[in-house]
UniProtKB/Swiss-Prot annotation:
GO terms for cellular component: cytoplasm; cytosol; TRC complex. Keywords: Cytoplasm, ER-Golgi transport, Transport. Belongs to the GET4 family. The keyword Cytoplasm applies. Interacts with MDY2/GET5. The keyword Transport applies. It is found in: Cytoplasm. Present with 5350 molecules/cell in log phase SD medium. Transmembrane segments: none annotated. This is Golgi to ER traffic protein 4. GO terms for biological process: post-translational protein targeting to endoplasmic reticulum membrane; protein insertion into ER membrane; vesicle-mediated transport. Its main location: cytoplasm.
Length: 312
């Protein structure tokens, strides 16, 4: 498209958006919605995808700001259709556009989970990330947490950015502190989520950092008896009364070494925990030590199923 034609189209698009905004301000939501969709359809049919995307995304944003969640989310779904049709790749601009929309979504919006699943499916399809874009995950996790979708938020934080990792630790720590009667095993229930989930996705760095933050908070709040010991160059916080926390720390280090004999010795030494975490250890045995499990366990497949809205 030559510059003059491009400028003309941009001017026309600007006028369309201005008329749309005027209808929104007047409360004429239905007509605004139908008119915008009709014009966007023309852009899509002529393969003017950039203009369609700009029109649809701005329209969705305006509806969300006007607290018209139904129309806003309808346009988000349409935007994702155009993203797919135009094969829009994951980059700073395409993700930022979605992040702006997520920020405006009401946490109680009935379509929230479907919108998020659609966004993430696009980022899986058009990025190098197996589970989708981490930056998008960070924003999604925060919005889900606003809506009290704690388990869903956990999944997205786990696969997000470094900031997401901090939020994930905060989430689990706050969760633990809400427990009325904390028993010895209660702490490990929450701590194990960090260790196992990061090991499942082979994020050793976040596993170590989240472990350190969590245990530091645990020591500061509950004052358990402990000593720090060096294990082959790795530091372990050895707890006198929390052997499950010791086991989980040693498991992390063992997976990092990828030494099969260490793994088997660890399981034999902590037989109770080996049984309690049987499925998780079978999967880690497959992933880190090439130990074929009697029954194949695939936590990553389960995770992917959850991301894709239940599909395999």
């Amino acid at each position: 498209m030559v510059p003059a034609e491009s400028n003309a189209v941009q001017a026309k698009l600007a006028k369309t958006l201005q008329r749309f905004e005027n209808k929104i301000k007047a409360g004429d939501y239905y007509e605004a919605h139908q008119t915008l969709r009709t014009i966007a359809n023309r852009y899509v049919r002529s393969k003017s995808y950039e203009h369609a995307i700009e029109l649809i995304s701005q329209g969705a944003l305006s509806f969300l700001k006007a607290k018209q969640g139904g129309s806003g989310t309808d346009l988000i779904f349409y935007l994702l259709e155009v993203y797919d049709l135009a094969e829009v790749k994951v980059d700073d601009i395409s993700v930022a556009r979605l992040v702006r929309l997520i920020a405006e979504l009401d946490p109680s919006e009935p379509n929230l989970k479907d919108v998020i699943t659609g966004m993430n499916n696009w980022s899986i399809k058009f990025s190098e990330y197996k589970f989708g874009d981490p930056y998008l995950h960070n924003t999604i996790g925060s919005k889900l947490l606003e809506g009290d979708f704690v388990y869903e938020a956990e999944r997205y934080f786990m696969l997000g950015t470094h900031d997401s990792m901090i939020k994930y630790v905060d989430l689990l720590w706050d969760w633990l502190c809400q427990v009325d009667d904390i028993e010895d095993s209660t702490v490990a229930e929450f701590f194990s989520r960090l260790v196992f989930n990061y090991l499942f996705i082979s994020n050793i760095s976040f596993a170590h950092e989240s472990k350190d933050i969590f245990l530091e908070r645990f020591i500061e709040k509950f004052h358990p008896k402990y000593e720090k010991i060096d294990k082959n160059g790795y530091e372990i916080v050895f707890f006198e009364d929390y052997s499950d926390l010791n086991f989980l720390q040693l498991l992390l280090i063992t997976c990092q070494t990828k030494d099969k004999s260490y793994f088997l010795n660890l399981k034999n030494h902590y037989l109770d925990f080996s049984q309690a975490y049987k499925s998780e250890l079978e999967f880690l045995g497959q992933e880190y030590f090439n130990i074929v499990a009697p029954k194949q366990t695939n936590f990553l497949q389960d995770m992917m199923s959850g991301f894709l809205g239940g599909s395999k």
